[in-house]
Amino acid sequence: PAGLADDLAAAFTEKTGVEVEQFQGTTGEILARLEAEQANPVADVVILASWSDGLGMKADGQLESHTPANADKVNEGWIDDDNMLFGSSASAVGVIYNTTVIPELSADWSELADAQYKDMIAIPDPEKSGACKDFLAGMVTGMDNGEAIMQSWADNGLTVPGANKAALEAVTTGEKGILIAGVDYNAYSSMAKGEPLNIYYPASGTVVNPRPAMILKTAPNMDNAKAFVDFL
């Protein structure tokens, strides 16, 4: 989230005197920029909303190994075995719905394929939303009949309006009634502004996405990059 990123950068600068230049965007936008800058690397540290995309960067040999300070205090499973991905924060995805269109909703994931929700459901684009990509991966690997459930959504008129914000906007305006794999902080931010939204987490469970912070092997400022990850 932009506010969290800005606060972290400001706090790091206050502590170390090192200025932080940021590029903020969707997971897809960040990965595209890194690819465009391969011949002339600019970034030192990358934080994504998708652990799976971080693993992809690791597999491609893009990441530097580092054992950060306070690594023993990080949640179990939030650092990979090679000390290349560090969970810096997390988001939980749930079901966001428009309370004007649907006053109350508590349907489980599979029940969102019911006829009463025909053509009312949307989901973020997983090519642009790292949180959604990890949610779908969790559905496939961690839930019984996950693939069948996703197919049932498609059969029930599921649409893909765009990245997280575009998908949420479709529900906020009432164009759609329900957003599957909605990011929690986006929902709470909109609700605080008075938008007719609510969010819940289905009874069968959901996916919590650690956001990996990673040091690039090509980091022009390697010492500062390691210091920033230590700070996180």
Label for each model-derived stretch:
Residues 1-6, 21, 25-31, 35, ...:
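Extracytoplasmic ligand-binding site segments that recognize negatively charged/polar headgroups
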Residues 5-18:
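The catalytic Nudix box helix
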Residues 167, 184-188, 204-207:
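Short, catalytically relevant binding-site loops at active-site mouths
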